[in-house]
């Protein structure tokens, strides 16, 4: 959005051409999401405490989990809007990959929000039942996988690390594999959330790596030089990864020991899905 407005003046103001570079916009989106989270983080924690939105833990859980009862949760309600706003500010909005990832973020975020909301009104660790949550996750992942598979120029070949000559074509089998990975990663991150920095730490490491690979795969020269698959348009995902990275670093400030805020299912489910 903001990138497009700046683009209109590039012919008149030469130094604005720097905004054409993905690396520069990635730095901006990382800083944008980081600063916004720092500014709004304290307000969000106070608001959640006022609304009595606290962490609920099963009675049979380990002692270090039980000690976290009452800590404000649903921090994802701040995390996700910051990620999306920063992405909308600095990303190329005509890129289908950006919109596909944001679709997954919104849908999994809504599933997580309903789950957290039910836990809050019931004042227990019971949210959405597995019979309700799992089919919804599979449906969203299935839509995303099908859209990606049908995208013109999409390559369903699987690249095996360290064996560049082995590239089996998955064909339609790519869709169920993608669904399995997306849903599995979503629930894996969800399971780790609940202790100080336990979920957000690996997320920061993972998205830092994704940021680099998205940039390399989206640049035909570097992809060819490093002999990695070239995916046209994927470079713009670097900007989105920067937004996730910045917001996650801001969240870590409040989630590190002693944790003042947890992301809840509304944050862990979509971040895990995007990770997948």
Residue ranges and their predicted role:
Residues 2-43, 79-110, 144-150, 156-163, ...:
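Alpha-helical transmembrane segments
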Residues 3-13, 50-51, 63-66, 74:
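N-terminal structured helix/loop subdomain that forms the ligand-binding/catalytic interface
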Residues 43-68, 117-126:
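Cytosolic, membrane-interface loops and tails of multi-pass inner-membrane proteins
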Residues 68-80, 131-140:
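Select subsegments of transmembrane alpha-helices in polytopic membrane proteins
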Residues 75, 116, 265:
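Divalent metal-coordination and catalytic microenvironments
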Residues 94-102, 121-136:
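Membrane-interfacial loop-to-helix junctions in multi-pass inner-membrane proteins
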Residues 112-114:
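Conserved ATP-binding subdomain of kinase catalytic cores across diverse folds
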Residues 119-129, 160-168:
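Membrane interface segments of multi-pass transport proteins and intramembrane proteases
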